[in-house]
Each structure stands twice: as structure tokens, then as C-alpha cells.
Amino acid sequence: MTQEIRRRNEPLLVGGMYGQGTSHYLVTEHLDGFLFPAVHLRRQDGYELDAVGAALYDTQRGVEIQWDYSLHGRFVPET
């Protein structure tokens, strides 16, 4: 039996930590200039990306962040 993946009606908060699979992403800022909600994310290993269409979803693994597509993905050393 498959479980439906459903979008949650909850905002992504700056400073919030959200999981996706085995990774965790920190929301560092909301981005302007996109048709869909976009946020800048930082993963624990230093990888950063801009996630467009980002939202929280109920999945088989629990609540996860997902997005439509990403831009500007890169590793950024901590300062």
C-alpha cells in the first residue's frame, strides 16, 4: 500500500532546520524575485543552494522539506 505525499500548509521559518532523507537543511533566508516561494538552504556539510518552490510535505519518512528545483548549489566553507 502506498502512502500519499501531501503538502503541509506551514511556512518555512528562517533559522528552522528541516530534514529530507538523511540530510538536514537550515533555512538561512527567504529569497525575492521568484514566482514560487524560494529559500536559501545550508546543509550540515557546508553545501548551500537556493530552493525554489520549497515547502513541507508529509512523506513516508515523516515531515520533509522538498522543492521544485534548485539554483546556485555549491560548497561554502564556514567563516
Identify what each model region corresponds to.
Residues 12-17, 36-37:
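Short, hydrophobic/aromatic-rich segments at coil-to-beta transitions
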